[in-house]
Amino acid sequence: MFLKRNAARVVLLDKKERIFLVNAEDPIDPFKEPWWEIPGGGIGRGEDSSVAAERELYEETGIDSIKMGPVIWTQHVQFTFGGYFFDSYEKIHVAWCDGGEYRPQHLEALEAAAFIGARWWELGELLQSEEPVLPTLLREHITPIIAGDLPEEPIDISPVQLEES
């Protein structure tokens, strides 16, 4: 099945300058390597991207006491997941919180089957890790965001060639 959608994601940072990532795998494709991703999902009809980002963050992580920031990045990605082909135009917000534990709320069945866990990552640890991450260019663009140097306009971080994730 082909799904063309607009989506919202969140780079969630805590007071210790760590980023929160969800560990996921494709429940349909056992040969696809697990990855770490920023929380997010589809934008509902008439829904603002910041509202969608906050809703998705809560559903996927259980973290709800946040300060939502602006859209820092955009990306156009195409990928297969759970037997679906996604063509996704994404707005990626930054948000801050005091911390929190992974306690997902209201996951869709496919998400519940895909999510392995989640945790906070320190910048150095993320930059040194060879674990696959999404967005694919997260490591290249995260350092100034964690330092508080937000772009005046969203930066397009789309992969050069659209690739499966």
Where are these regions (language model features)?
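Unchanged
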Residues: G42-K67, Q75-V133
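Generic short beta-strand segments
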Residues: N23-E25, V71-V77
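N-terminal strand-loop-strand
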Residues: M1-E37, S65
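Nudix hydrolase/Nudix homology domain
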Residues: I28, P34-W35, Y102-S165
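Hydrophobic/anchoring residues in structured secondary elements
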Residues: M68-W73, L162
